[in-house]
């Protein structure tokens, strides 16, 4: 049961705009670095490995802490956690722009990850609390425009700002947007869960989760350098497997677990969350395709970002279409249609062996299908996950759902980048990009199968 300060409060457009602006601090601004990797190498006088760590660490830390933050939002207040997240983004952005020291870049990006971990589940919970029925679906559509739409715009946005104003302006603008979001959310009554007791936070679960995910990230990003037979590689693999096994055992026994596995008894929630993880994993497409056209075809970051304009346009248009399809067809069909269309787009973008002019045409069309598919998928998936969560666990459920988003993006970028680098070194940059993009298409196919098997045609939602 919810217990907001003013039970009669209903969500309005002012609050919704503040929520969307807070969401894009991660999905638009923080994610824009996928298209400015070469520029950051020069600006910080460092190697691509360090820059790739800085690019992926935000989503990684967001994913590691988002579930815990969702639980804290349920216990201590969703408005409070949202405001804390916005302030953390301002701090992280300041650390990134004040110097050319790579360590501060990484620390700033890490703090931005913590910011996103606070904002995402808290804002979804606010929507669950203060918007009802079609108003909630509308609010979720705009939330999806901030998240999926922001990820669609980020490549072009990052390239345009970096080319025209300088890359630091990405984060200057992020600070300005954060201040506006704080102003718009101010005055909204607090909402928190009444039924969850304030038990001790699951520190053991969080530590094990962090150890597991950091070990996996290092294995993916540095595995080829370490060598699969090296002692360090084997040790990290053992740590990852061991910490994962221990995490499962402890979480099932814990009275107040970091991840409540009972949520996954609902097939609709499980299907939405698992497919969400995989479709966020195809974010690796952006870093591979952008790096390929810059390194292989000699394009600038602005030119590379311009290829994805069709992605930008379609994802923004189709999110509201996805909302209407949800209302008329239910959740499963739009999720399947969106995923299928995305796979077609992914295959077109992977045709790196074509002559430049034909590849550019395929990229433009491919990104169009890419954005169209994600736009159709976004709102039905988010609504399925949130509507199937118990009201008293909505913060944790939203946290797990957005953990899937963040970790999918982090590992998608890391894995795609690793495959791209390894295959390029073994063959050439064209084959490396093609194989890495095929990996993303495979994730889309697996997502399609999961939706087909787990998401029911008519799921019973809690609206």
Swiss-Prot record:
Domain of life the protein comes from: Bacteria
Pfam families recorded: MFS_1
Keyword Chloroplast carried by entry: no
Signal peptide: none
SUPFAM superfamilies xref list: MFS general substrate transporter
UniProt keyword annotations, A-Z: Antibiotic resistance, Cell membrane, Membrane, Transmembrane, Transmembrane helix, Transport
Homology family: Belongs to the major facilitator superfamily. TCR/Tet family.
Role of this protein: Multidrug efflux pump that acts independently of NorA and is one of the factors that confers resistance against diverse quinolones and chemical compounds.
Designated name of the protein: Quinolone resistance protein NorB
Organism: Staphylococcus aureus (strain COL)
Upper lineage: Bacteria, Bacillati, Bacillota, Bacilli, Bacillales
């Amino acid at each position: 049961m919810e217990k907001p300060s003013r039970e009669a409060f209903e969500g309005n457009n002012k609050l919704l705009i503040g929520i969307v602006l807070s969401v894009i601090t991660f999905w638009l601004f923080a994610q824009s670095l996928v298209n400015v990797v070469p520029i950051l190498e020069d600006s910080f006088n460092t190697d691509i490995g360090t820059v790739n760590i800085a690019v992926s660490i935000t989503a990684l830390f967001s994913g590691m802490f988002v579930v815990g933050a969702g639980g804290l939002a349920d216990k201590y207040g969703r408005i409070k956690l949202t405001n804390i997240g916005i302030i953390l983004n301002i701090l992280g952005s300041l650390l990134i722009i004040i110097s050319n020291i790579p360590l501060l870049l990484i620390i700033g990006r890490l703090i931005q990850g913590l910011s996103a971990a606070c904002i995402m589940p808290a804002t979804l919970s606010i929507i669950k609390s203060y918007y009802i029925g079609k108003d909630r679906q509308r609010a979720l559509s705009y939330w999806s425009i901030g998240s999926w739409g922001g990820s669609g715009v980020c490549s072009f946005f990052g390239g345009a700002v970096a080319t025209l104003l300088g890359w630091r302006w990405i984060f200057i603008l992020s600070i300005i947007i954060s201040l506006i979001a704080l102003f718009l959310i101010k005055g909204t009554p607090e909402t928190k869960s009444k039924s969850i007791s304030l038990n001790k936070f699951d520190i053991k679960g969080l530590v094990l989760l962090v150890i597991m995910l950091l070990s996996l990230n290092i294995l993916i990003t540095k595995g080829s350098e370490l060598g699969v037979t090296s002692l360090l590689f084997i040790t990290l693999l053992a740590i990852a497997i061991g910490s994962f096994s221990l995490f499962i055992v402890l979480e099932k026994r814990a009275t107040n677990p970091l991840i409540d596995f009972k949520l996954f008894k609902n097939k609709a929630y499980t299907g939405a969350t698992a497919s969400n993880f995989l479709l966020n994993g195809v974010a690796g497409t952006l870093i591979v395709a952008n790096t390929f056209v810059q390194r292989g075809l000699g394009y600038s970051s602005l030119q590379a970002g311009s290829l994805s304009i069709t992605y930008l346009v379609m994802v923004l248009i189709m999110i509201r279409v996805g909302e209407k399809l949800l209302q008329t067809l239910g959740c499963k069909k739009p999720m399947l249609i969106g995923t299928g269309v995305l796979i077609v787009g992914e295959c077109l973008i992977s045709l790196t062996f074509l002559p430049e002019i034909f590849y550019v045409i395929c990229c433009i069309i491919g990104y169009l299908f890419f954005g169209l598919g994600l736009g159709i998928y976004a709102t039905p998936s988010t609504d399925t996950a949130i509507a199937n969560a118990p009201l008293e666990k909505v913060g944790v459920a939203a946290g797990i759902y957005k953990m899937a988003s963040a970790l999918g993006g982090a590992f998608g970028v890391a894995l795609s980048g690793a495959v791209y680098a390894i295959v390029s070194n073994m063959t050439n940059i064209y084959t490396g990009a093609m194989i890495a993009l095929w990996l993303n298409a495979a994730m889309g196919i697996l997502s399609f199968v999961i939706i087909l098997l787990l998401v029911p045609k008519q799921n019973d939602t809690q609206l």
